[in-house]
């Protein structure tokens, strides 16, 4: 049997043992808890002195400082260039994390390796020392186990009750001398031969400190058991939790404590309350402190240090691949820590709704409690809804959270007035102020599906909140009073109203205030860029007057865009120096992210697809644009006799065509206005992707007109210079609708012939929407659906007719795309684009 097979068998046996032990613990614990009267547990909790609770929590938080001695020993042994204060802070964070999700200490060992490898040259020695620390966590327990074996601590009752623990106790006791001998004979560093012994002493003191915390919990709930028996039960319970490999020993530790004190005649309700207090004081409080420390300890400075560290090694395998993300992970720790703290705060104060409702049951002024309960619940829900926004460092989310904290403080002061909780709220508020100053964006984009999800989530949370309160009152036999007083009857709707007012007011203020922040370069800069680098088929639309411009720092590339519904809709590809497009888009996306806007590109070519892809976008084919090769275009030949017939017909009717250069007279503009108004027939003009009938816009390029024999304008088209590839296009094409003449054909034919005469080589006839979209079985579902619209809804919009019309000019078809973020909805993005096009 080779080593690989042995390792696999060992892993399977280990997993099987842990799973079987976990199932056994859960079943046994459930059986023990099923007989507990939770009402008595709550009554016992209400008797606890609040100052004793404060001292307990302080003691629980302070007890974890002892574990920091591991890291002090480690830093001194390896001569790390790191201050004692930083060691203590980082160590506290690591140990608090390890206590919750330790998996036998392996999580803590991994985090230590990640943090301290930047402070030492000898990585191999670091790993050896960390392994020694990991093992020494058991040696301290081994030393205490020896004291039970030699009857210093009396555990006879529990050993008789749980016989299998005796063998674990003996095995662990034998581990200590073996470890001491091995660590002294083969130390990780010959100059530090007694490190193993030092770590064992630290481990022993730490386990005793944890036992003292549990003992203090017992004293608070009035459990009368000798200190020696307390320690004995704790040691055996800790061994059970360690062997189970369950994070924090949850379940196994608690079961042994429950059974141990039950053998001593302690009521189960008191033991349960003692365990809950212990878990909160020794696990939850240190985690809270660690999260607060993380908000200050990690962040920009840590990220910069690691990025500049000569010890930072590129990823080469799975482990190093994960480690390569450490600078990003560490940079996010402060916001993640604060988000977790806000989440816990929300949950804690949701539970405190019970206190408000309970007080309201015995108070005649129910109206006041309606309002206070609704405010309190609204604030808790707002905290919960903005957890993700806080993690994403959104200032708007942080403001929502700060307002929520203030509302909770007000509700707390007017109801149960817990100064411990108010102190906690003040701490969270201070952390939110720090986070607000560090925030990297004003707000996150508002998306319809997110709003719907938040609404459904809010209803669900409020429903669960009501069920929780009602269920608790049923358990306490006071629900009958609640039904008579109707404290819970209407506050759901009041809560929704308060949330709507707060959310609506802040959202409106942000949109109003920061709409002024949107920057726009002047049109002269854009003209200079086009003059130097050329434009594209859409660049002439800079003169339409309905767009803003974003220019890069070097002023050699720009985008034209328009704001609509928390989105920046960009028209076409970037314009200018192609080498600057990457920098331009990065600056634009940073700008949009800061303001909390989505970015949508409309009608882009396939030339820059890789560039858009780099920014996390996906694509939807809008259709194809007809580009006519003027070098091949002609009205001669059999296939073109229709073109000649059209031109001949206009000649017979004495209808002429000419190009008028700006500036234009008022009389000429009035003639065009008359034709345009009749053509529009009270329909609204489109915007953004096309020009509008506007004298300023029209005066920027020549206009082609067709006149009748009376020299009256009957049709016109505005030219669109492209400033690249010897190409030209037309924008507005309008004619008198009452004339039964092929005026559109006439304008196009005359423009094609004129453009060819002027030396242009390409003519853009515009896009055929949804043309050639989703034609293959392998296409995306959304594109296949769009293709069916093209085929079967021609009555609503002339999709096929437009393609057929342009096809007779034998164009080359070039695809055009919608570009939008991969986490955005296609239909929502299309809707925003259409709103931009159809509204001024």
Swiss-Prot record:
Example of a GO cellular component annotation carried by this entry: plasma membrane
Query: Which parts of the sequence lie on the Cytoplasmic side of the lipid bilayer?
Result: 1-8, 74-89, 150-161, 222-229, 293-337, 391-394, 437-450, 511-840
High-level lineage: Bacteria, Bacillati, Bacillota, Bacilli, Bacillales
**Similarity section:** Belongs to the LPG synthase family.
UniProt xrefs under SUPFAM superfamilies: Acyl-CoA N-acyltransferases (Nat) (SSF55729)
Q: Which GO terms describe its molecular function?
A: phosphatidylglycerol lysyltransferase activity
Q: What is this protein called?
A: Phosphatidylglycerol lysyltransferase
Residue ranges that the Swiss-Prot or TrEMBL entry lists as coiled coil: none
Per UniProt, what is one Pfam family of this protein?
LPG_synthase_C
Q: Which residues lie on this side of the membrane: Extracellular?
A: 30-52, 111-128, 183-200, 251-271, 359-369, 472-489
Q: Give the catalysed reaction(s), semicolon-separated.
A: L-lysyl-tRNA(Lys) + a 1,2-diacyl-sn-glycero-3-phospho-(1'-sn-glycerol) = a 1,2-diacyl-sn-glycero-3-phospho-1'-(3'-O-L-lysyl)-sn-glycerol + tRNA(Lys)
Mark the transmembrane ranges.
9-29, 53-73, 90-110, 129-149, 162-182, 201-221, 230-250, 272-292, 338-358, 370-390, 395-415, 416-436, 451-471, 490-510
Main localization of the protein? Answer: membrane
């Amino acid at each position: 049997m080779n080593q690989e097979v042995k390792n696999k068998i060992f892993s399977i046996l280990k997993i099987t043992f842990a799973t079987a032990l976990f199932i056994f613990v859960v079943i046994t614990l459930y059986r023990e808890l099923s007989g507990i009267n939770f009402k008595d547990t709550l009554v016992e909790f209400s008797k606890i002195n609040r100052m004793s609770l404060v001292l307990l929590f302080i003691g629980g938080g302070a007890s974890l400082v002892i574990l920091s001695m591991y890291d002090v020993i480690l830093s001194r042994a390896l001569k790390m260039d790191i201050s004692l204060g930083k060691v203590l802070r980082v160590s506290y964070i690591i140990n608090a994390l390890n206590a919750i999700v330790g998996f036998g200490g392996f999580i803590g060992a991994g985090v230590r390796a990640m943090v301290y490898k930047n402070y030492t040259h000898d990585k191999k020695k670091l790993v050896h020392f960390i392994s020694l620390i990991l093992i020494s966590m058991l040696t301290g327990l081994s030393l205490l186990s020896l004291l039970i074996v030699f009857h210093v601590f009396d555990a006879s009752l529990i050993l008789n009750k749980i016989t299998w623990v005796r063998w674990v106790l003996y095995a662990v006791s034998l581990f200590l001398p073996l470890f001491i001998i091995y660590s002294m004979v083969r130390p990780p560093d010959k100059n530090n031969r007694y490190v193993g012994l030092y770590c064992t002493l630290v481990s022993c003191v730490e386990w005793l400190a944890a036992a003292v915390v549990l003992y203090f919990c017992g004293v608070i709930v009035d459990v009368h058991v000798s200190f020696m028996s307390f320690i004995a039960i704790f040691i055996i319970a800790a061994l059970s939790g360690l062997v189970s490999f369950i994070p924090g020993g949850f379940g196994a530790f608690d079961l042994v404590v429950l059974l141990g004190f039950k053998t001593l005649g302690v009521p189960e309700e008191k033991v349960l309350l003692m365990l809950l207090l212990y878990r909160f004081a020794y696990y939850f409080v240190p985690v809270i402190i660690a999260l607060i420390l993380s908000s200050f300890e990690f962040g920009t400075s840590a990220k910069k240090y690691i990025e500049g560290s000569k010890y930072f090694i590129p990823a080469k395998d799975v482990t190093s691949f994960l480690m390569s993300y450490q600078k990003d992970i560490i940079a996010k720790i402060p916001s993640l820590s604060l988000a977790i703290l806000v989440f816990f705060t929300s949950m804690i104060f949701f539970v405190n709704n019970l206190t408000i409702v309970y007080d309201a049951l015995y108070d005649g002024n129910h109206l006041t409690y309606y309002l206070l309960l609704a405010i309190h619940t609204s604030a808790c829900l707002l905290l919960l809804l903005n957890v993700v926004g806080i993690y994403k460092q959104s200032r708007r989310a942080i403001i929502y959270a700060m307002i929520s904290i203030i509302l909770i403080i007000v509700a707390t002061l007017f109801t149960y007035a817990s100064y411990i909780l108010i102190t906690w709220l003040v701490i969270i508020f201070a952390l939110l102020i720090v986070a607000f100053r560090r925030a990297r964006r004003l707000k996150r984009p508002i998306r319809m599906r997110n709003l719907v999800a938040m609404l459904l989530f809010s209803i669900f949370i409020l429903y669960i909140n009501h069920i929780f309160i009602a269920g608790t009152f049923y358990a306490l036999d006071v629900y009958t009073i609640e039904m008579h007083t109707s404290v819970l009857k209407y506050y759901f709707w009041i809560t929704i109203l308060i949330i709507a007012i707060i959310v609506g007011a802040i959202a409106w203020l942000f949109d109003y205030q920061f709409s002024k922040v949107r920057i726009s370069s002047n049109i002269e800069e854009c003209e200079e860029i086009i003059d130097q680098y050329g434009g594209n088929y859409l660049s002439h639309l800079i003169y339409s007057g309905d767009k803003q411009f974003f220019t890069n720092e070097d002023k050699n590339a720009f985008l034209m865009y328009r704001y609509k519904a928390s989105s920046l809709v960009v028209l076409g590809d970037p314009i200018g120096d192609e080498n600057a497009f990457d920098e331009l888009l990065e600056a634009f996306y940073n700008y949009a992210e800061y303001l909390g806007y989505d970015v949508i590109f409309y009608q882009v070519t396939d030339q820059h697809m890789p560039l858009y892809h780099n920014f996390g976008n996906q694509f939807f084919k809008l259709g194809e644009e007809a580009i006519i090769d003027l070098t091949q275009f002609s009205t001669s030949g059999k296939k073109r006799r229709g073109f000649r017939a059209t031109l001949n017909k206009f000649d017979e009717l004495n209808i002429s065509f000419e190009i008028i250069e700006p500036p234009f007279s008022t009389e000429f503009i009035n003639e065009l206005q008359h034709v345009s108004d009749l053509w529009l027939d009270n329909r609204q003009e489109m915007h953004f992707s096309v020009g509008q009938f506007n004298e300023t816009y029209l005066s920027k390029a020549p206009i082609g007109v067709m006149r009748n024999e009376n020299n009256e304008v009957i049709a016109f088209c505005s030219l669109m210079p492209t400033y690249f590839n010897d190409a030209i296009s037309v924008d507005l094409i309008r004619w008198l609708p009452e004339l039964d003449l092929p005026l559109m054909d006439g304008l196009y034919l005359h423009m094609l012939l004129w453009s060819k005469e002027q030396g242009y080589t390409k003519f853009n006839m515009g896009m055929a929407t949804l043309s050639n979209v989703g034609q293959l079985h392998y296409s995306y579902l959304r594109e296949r659906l769009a293709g069916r619209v093209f085929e079967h809804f021609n009555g609503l919009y002339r999709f096929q007719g437009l393609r057929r019309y342009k096809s007779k000019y034998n164009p080359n078809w070039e695809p055009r795309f919608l570009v939008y973020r991969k986490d955005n909805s296609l239909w929502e993005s299309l809707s925003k684009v259409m709103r931009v096009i159809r509204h001024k």
